[in-house]
C-alpha cells in the first residue's frame, strides 16, 4: 500500500494492478467516480513473479520480477500522481495527462530470484545461488558473502546449499543474511563479520526484523530471536503460518528507520514506528477459519 500516493498494489492473475485507496475503501453509498479512478495494470499479462516497494535516494519505487524461467528481469516503476495530502486539499484527484506510474529503470539477474531488499542507494536480490547486491546506477551484481579466506570456509560450506531469504540491515556497518535454516553476519562490504552461525530451530519461509528481534516464520511456528546475539527468545506455535506484514515500510521490509534496542540500535520496525509484524494461521478449533495475529513487544521481555 502506497498511502503517500493514495494507491494500493496487488497481484491478480499474475499481473500487477494499482488501485486508488478511495475505491478499495469505498462504502456502499460512496460516490467515487469509478471512471476517473479505474485500476491500472502495471505489467504484462500473467508475467509477474513478485513485487516490492520502497524508497531509494528519496524516490518511491516499485520493483517487480517478470516470470522468466532460469533468469530474472526486473522492471522498476515510479508513482507520479500527486500525494494524497495534496489530493485532499484539492478535494479531488486530478488525472490530467499523467499516469499512475512511469517506467523508471530495469535490470537483469542471470538466475532465478525470489526476493529483494532495498537500502538507501543499493538493493539485495535473493537468488537460487545466494545474494546479489547492486545499485541501479551501475547494475553490476556483487555476490554476498565474500567467500575468500580460510577463516570463513566453515561458514561458506554451511550456507552453500541453503535457500536465501533476505538481507536485513542491523546497523550502518552490519547486515544479517537470512537463509532457510540459519543466518550469518556480514559487514557493509559483504565480508563475513563474525565467526558464528545463527542456527534456527525450524525452516524459515520468511524472515523480518521487529525492533531488536529477528522474527522467523516456519509453517508450524514463529521463532523469535535476538538479532544481535542470536539467542532464542520465544516460540509461537500454530499451523499453516504465513507472514502477512513484515512491519517494514510499504510492507516490503525496506528502509527501516533506526529503532533503539537494548543492546544497540537495530534497523528494524516497531510499534513506535507505526508498523508491526502480522501473521495469519489456521484457527486452532475451527478448520474453516483463519486468525490474524499481531506481534507486539512485551515490556517485560525487553533486554536492558
Feature-to-residue mapping (PLM):
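Extended acidic/polar alpha-helical scaffold segments
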Residues: 234-235
Amino acid at each position: 500500500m502506497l498511502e503517500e500516493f493514495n494507491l494500493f498494489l496487488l497481484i491478480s492473475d499474475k499481473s500487477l494492478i494499482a488501485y486508488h485507496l478511495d475505491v478499495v475503501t469505498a462504502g456502499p453509498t460512496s460516490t467515487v467516480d469509478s471512471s476517473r479512478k479505474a485500476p491500472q495494470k502495471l505489467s504484462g499479462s500473467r508475467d509477474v513473479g513478485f513485487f516490492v516497494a520502497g524508497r531509494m535516494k528519496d524516490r518511491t519505487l516499485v520493483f517487480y520480477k517478470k516470470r522468466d524461467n532460469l533468469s530474472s528481469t526486473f522492471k522498476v516503476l515510479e508513482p507520479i500522481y500527486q500525494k494524497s495530502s495534496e489530493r485532499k486539499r484539492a478535494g479531488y484527484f486530478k488525472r490530467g495527462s499523467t499516469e499512475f506510474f512511469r517506467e523508471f529503470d530495469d535490470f537483469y539477474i542471470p538466475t532465478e530470484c525470489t526476493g529483494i531488499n532495498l537500502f538507501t542507494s543499493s538493493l539485495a536480490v535473493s537468488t537460487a545461488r545466494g545474494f546479489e547486491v547492486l545499485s541501479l546506477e551501475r547494475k553490476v551484481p556483487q555476490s554476498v558473502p565474500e567467500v575468500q579466506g580460510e577463516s570463513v570456509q566453515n561458514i561458506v560450506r554451511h550456507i552453500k546449499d541453503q535457500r536465501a531469504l533476505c538481507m536485513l540491515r542491523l546497523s550502518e556497518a552490519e547486515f544479517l543474511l537470512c537463509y532457510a535454516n540459519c543466518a550469518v553476519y556480514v559487514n557493509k562490504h559483504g565480508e563475513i563479520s563474525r565467526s558464528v552461525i545463527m542456527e534456527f530451530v525450524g525452516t524459515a519461509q520468511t524472515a523480518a526484523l521487529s525492533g531488536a528481534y529477528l522474527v522467523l516464520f516456519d509453517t508450524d511456528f514463529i521463532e523469535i530471536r535476538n538479532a544481535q546475539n542470536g539467542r532464542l527468545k520465544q516460540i509461537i506455535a500454530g499451523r499453516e503460518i504465513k507472514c502477512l506484514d513484515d512491519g517494514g515500510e510499504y510492507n516490503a521490509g525496506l528502509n527501516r528507520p533506526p529503532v533503539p534496542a537494548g543492546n544497540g540500535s537495530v534497523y528494524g520496525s516497531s510499534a513506535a514506528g507505526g508498523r508491526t509484524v502480522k501473521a495469519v494461521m489456521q484457527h486452532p478449533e475451527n478448520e474453516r477459519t483463519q486468525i490474524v495475529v499481531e506481534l507486539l513487544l512485551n515490556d517485560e521481555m525487553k533486554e536492558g
